[in-house]
Curated annotation (Swiss-Prot):
Pathway noted in the entry: Mycotoxin biosynthesis
GO molecular function, one term: UDP-glycosyltransferase activity
Protein name (database record): Glycosyltransferase buaB
Any Pfam family: UDPGT
Species assigned in the record: Petromyces alliaceus (Aspergillus alliaceus)
Bilayer topology annotation: Single-pass membrane protein
Membrane spanning residue stretches: 181-201
Assigned keywords, A-Z: Antibiotic biosynthesis, Glycoprotein, Glycosyltransferase, Membrane, Transferase, Transmembrane, Transmembrane helix
Record's function text: Glycosyltransferase; part of the gene cluster that mediates the biosynthesis of burnettramic acids, an unusual class of bolaamphiphilic pyrrolizidinediones that display potent antibacterial, antifungal, and cytotoxic activities. The first step of the biosynthesis of burnettramic acids is the hydroxylation of proline by the proline hydroxylase buaE to generate 4-hydroxyproline. The PKS-NRPS buaA and trans-enoyl reductase buaC construct the highly reduced polyketide chain, and the condensation (C) domain of buaA then catalyzes the amide bond formation with the activated 4-hydroxyproline.
List of glycosylated residues: 252
Domain of life: Eukaryota
Compartments in which it is found: Membrane
Primary localization class, coarse: membrane
Length: 490
């Protein structure tokens, strides 16, 4: 109808690691008021979507996280790097990531996506690459769609690199191998790729779901398998060429820069005055990390080493105790006191412990006092740190987080914090990694690199309308929104 706004529909998993880029781009589209925005996901995402004044459509069935729990997995199982750990991750973890639902759980979600496409008749659909029912529905209905991913170039493009570089140049997921691969590790990479194909792509779970899909009229293999990169649809990613390993980027892929939702400034938060006192390290291993007291003690050992070496620094530590820990008899209400008892008295004013970071981790990273981010290697954390221009210490625990650890070292913007102890932490090893990173910041070379990458992110802004040229945190979402608007108005 004349004057009616075009409709953009986002189909996504509800887990924040996947949906954060959807929330960011949806909010930017709403800000520009150029289209009608809808988001379809599971009920866990409803409150966040509706807070953006965006129409939310609840999907039936189990979310990805719930489906993994139904399979007996604690979301994603931790594993060690190296040959044995990687093979174990393919056997127990990765096949469930690409096929979290069995046919009985997949079908109602897929049917609901079909119904929603028929009802809304969107001008464009943006799909989460790990949300298979959504991509299948778009392909069956022959909708115009693109893929919006929080992951890196390497995650999606390694298998389409020329000259079989997937085999001999880039470390396979879960391996913890460096990039570029030294000659003596190439044979191990070969072996792990074979095991990945065997235990993931050719697993009974994946093959059963694939055959069922084909039987009900869905063509091809699972769209969630990274090896099935679709060169016929546009892709939007938070990577830029300077923030990843050297790769050949197909013309249907747009690197936007970090795709970060708008966030509240820390200026009016009680934390602001504490942050302003000293250079600050943010230590946040993610919401999945629940510490046993023995793990917390290792962190305290590391932080004590750092603060005795650098008496002008302080650390904000997100720490929540696991109440499944048999070694801890502390009730939940005494988490804070149990952790505080581990911290040396002379350091209590320089280690602030919190069970939840307010206003948000991004708010802390954006503060002028923050100089370093210690995190688990999630793609969102990595890209947030790049945008903030801070150094990184990565403590990987599973799958692609080992790639992120290799990536920060390759880019010279950080170090790995648990090279020997992964997927766990060992105090002296972690403390030494943080100290080395701090030294390189103070000596200038790492600080120069983080600022260079931040400048490359800002350079993506050309031709994109925004709030100002210095708003590095909005570059990615604005560029992604521009691609979407260009597509629906072409």
């Amino acid at each position: 109808m004349p004057g009616q706004k075009p409709v953009v529909l986002f189909l996504t998993n509800s887990e924040f690691g996947q949906s954060s880029v959807v929330l960011a781009v949806a909010q930017e589209l709403v800000r520009q008021s150029a289209c009608e925005v809808h988001v379809a996901s599971f009920s866990a995402l409803k409150q966040q979507v509706e807070a953006l004044n965006v129409a939310f459509h609840a999907l039936p069935g189990r979310s990805m996280k719930e489906a993994l729990c139904d399979s007996g997995l604690p979301f994603l199982p931790k594993h060690a790097p190296g040959t044995r750990g990687a093979v174990e991750s393919y056997r127990k973890g990765l096949q469930h990531v690409v096929a979290p639902w069995e046919p009985a759980g997949y079908e109602p979600i897929y049917r609901a996506c079909l119904d929603l496409l028929d009802k809304l008749n969107p001008d464009l659909v943006a799909v989460d690459p790990l949300f298979g029912p959504g991509q299948d529905a778009c392909n069956v209905r022959q909708c115009r769609y693109l893929v919006l991913s929080p992951a890196s170039f390497k995650d999606h493009l390694v298998q389409v690199q020329p000259h079989l570089r997937v085999l001999w140049k880039y470390p396979v997921i879960s391996s913890g191998l460096p990039c570029p691969l030294p000659l003596f590790l190439i044979i191990i990479n070969f072996y792990l790729i074979f095991k990945l194909v065997l235990h993931t792509f050719l697993s009974k779970r994946v093959q059963t779901l694939t055959k069922w899909r084909n039987h009900i009229g869905i063509p091809g293999d699972l769209t969630t398998i990274y090896a099935n990169f679709n060169e016929k649809v546009p892709w939007l990613l938070p990577s830029i060429p300077q923030s990843d390993f050297p790769l050949k980027i197909p013309t249907n892929v747009t690197g936007c820069g970090p795709i970060i939702p708008p966030f509240e400034s820390v200026a009016h938060n009680p934390t602001a005055s504490w942050l302003a006192q000293r250079p600050t390290i943010l230590f946040n291993l993610g919401s999945h990390m629940k510490y046993k007291l023995t793990d917390a003690q290792q962190v305290v050992t590391a932080l004590s080493m750092v603060l005795h070496t650098y008496p002008d620094m302080q650390i904000l530590w997100k720490c929540e105790l696991s109440h499944d820990d048999p070694s801890s008899k502390e009730p939940e209400s005494s988490d804070s006191s149990a952790i505080q008892d581990l911290i040396p008295a002379e350091l209590t004013d320089r280690i602030r412990v919190t069970s939840w970071i307010t206003p948000s981790p991004m708010s802390i990273l954006a503060h002028d006092s923050t100089i370093m981010y210690v995190h688990h290697g999630g793609s969102n954390s990595f890209h947030e740190a790049l945008a903030a221009g801070v150094a990184q210490v990565v403590c990987p625990v599973w799958l692609d987080t080992y790639d992120v650890a290799a990536r920060v070292e390759f880019l010279r913007v950080g170090l790995r914090g648990n090279g020997k102890a992964a997927p766990h932490l060992e105090g002296s090893e972690l403390g030494a990694a943080i100290c080395r990173t701090a030294h390189r910041l103070r000596s200038g070379d790492m600080g120069t690199r983080t600022r260079e990458l931040q400048a490359h992110i800002l350079a993506q802004e050309e031709g994109v309308s925004g709030t100002g040229p210095a708003d590095v945190y909005g570059v990615g979402r604005r560029k992604a929104a521009k691609v979407i608007l260009d597509m629906i108005t072409a």
